[in-house]
């Protein structure tokens, strides 16, 4: 009897693991994504993409930390497009890189993507997309609202990780 229970338990856990792995999870409908597409997959272009992403994350953190709704976030992003372009330009200049770039905000296509073991469906999503150069390289993406991947960037350039669930609970339930 004990062996049967163990066997059934193992089958149950395998079933759950299989279902979780193969289910699609979606980012909430009311979300704003952020994407940086590299010029190419060369080491140099991927490094440039990373530096642009990091510079913009600092700006986003400062601007969006006061946002409580998707409308707040949308307005902040729309009103700061020139600031994002300036940040990209300054970052490229610091790297001594002369490269075209495009900044667009609106509905943009995202391919199916796996992030931290969760598969997100492809589709058109409201997003801020930065395309560097030819935009033929690997991309970075995350979600600006709700702040699923926002990192708190401190002034000394250290990155501190926060607990998303706690932050969301504090912000939306406790109104901190």
Regions found by a protein language model. Name each.
Residues 19-29:
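Aromatic-capped interface at the extracytoplasmic side
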């Amino acid at each position: 009897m004990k062996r049967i229970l163990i066997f059934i338990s193992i089958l149950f856990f395998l079933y759950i693991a299989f279902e979780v792995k193969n289910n699609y999870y979606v980012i909430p409908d009311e979300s704003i994504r952020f994407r940086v597409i590299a010029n190419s997959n060369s080491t140099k272009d991927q490094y440039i993409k990373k530096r642009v992403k990091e510079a913009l994350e600092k700006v986003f953190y400062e601007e969006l930390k006061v946002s409580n709704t998707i409308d707040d976030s949308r307005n902040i992003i729309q009103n700061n497009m020139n600031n994002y372009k300036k940040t990209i330009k300054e970052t490229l200049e610091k790297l001594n890189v002369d490269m075209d770039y495009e900044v667009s905000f609106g509905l943009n296509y995202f391919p199916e993507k796996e992030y931290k073991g969760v598969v997100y469906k492809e589709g058109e999503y409201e997003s801020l997309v930065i395309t560097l150069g030819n935009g033929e390289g690997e991309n970075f993406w995350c979600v600006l609202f709700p702040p699923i991947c926002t990192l708190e960037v401190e002034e000394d350039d250290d990155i501190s990780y926060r607990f998303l669930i706690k932050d969301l609970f504090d912000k939306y339930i406790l109104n901190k």
